[in-house]
């Protein structure tokens, strides 16, 4: 059995970075180094007080230490990691672009009063779970050892459990909406029409190549000398649509 350090080292880069930032954000809140009120997305303060950091920090706060926090962190460690290692294997730039698209979509939807939510880390996790469930619809999932179901239904079951345990409905619902928006334009629409409107931009490929983050076998730009390059088998329907 691998040690915790070896397990952490084996995690794919984007999921590892996102989960780590979420964990340490909550640690800093717990130590009273960060005030959670300064992390929330609150547009009046963003535009009137120029507190632009809220646009970013709201994605890395999953709430205080609690069972719900632990569950969401485990979702990143499980479903985010499986998605990045599975359908997005050797496609780091594409995975990063999915996260960026999700973040932008959540920021836009949060402008609508009826959809407004102050902590965007929660819908971001729901988005990852939704996309994974669409890429692996027939995988068997065991919920708390008492319920077994196909992965396709996982986001909706988790949404129901959130409501049962007293969490707000909107964050999870927003994540499902944005996840479906991504999956429709990145997978379903290209399959139907042959046109992919969500092809990963070159500037995202350049970021991955410049900082040598993970691997991108179908990259339109070259990594720096000594950078990792590779080819191999790809899993998941999304890959074939991003070439």
From Swiss-Prot:
Bilayer-spanning residue ranges: 21-41, 55-75, 95-115, 156-176
Induction annotation: By endoplasmic reticulum stress.
Ranges per topology, Cytoplasmic: 1-20, 76-94, 177-243
Summary of the tissues where the protein is detected: Expressed in roots and endosperm.
Any GO BP annotation: ERAD pathway
The protein's role, per its UniProt record: May be involved in the degradation process of specific misfolded endoplasmic reticulum (ER) luminal proteins.
Protein name from the UniProt record: Derlin-1.2
Species whose genome carries this gene: Zea mays (Maize)
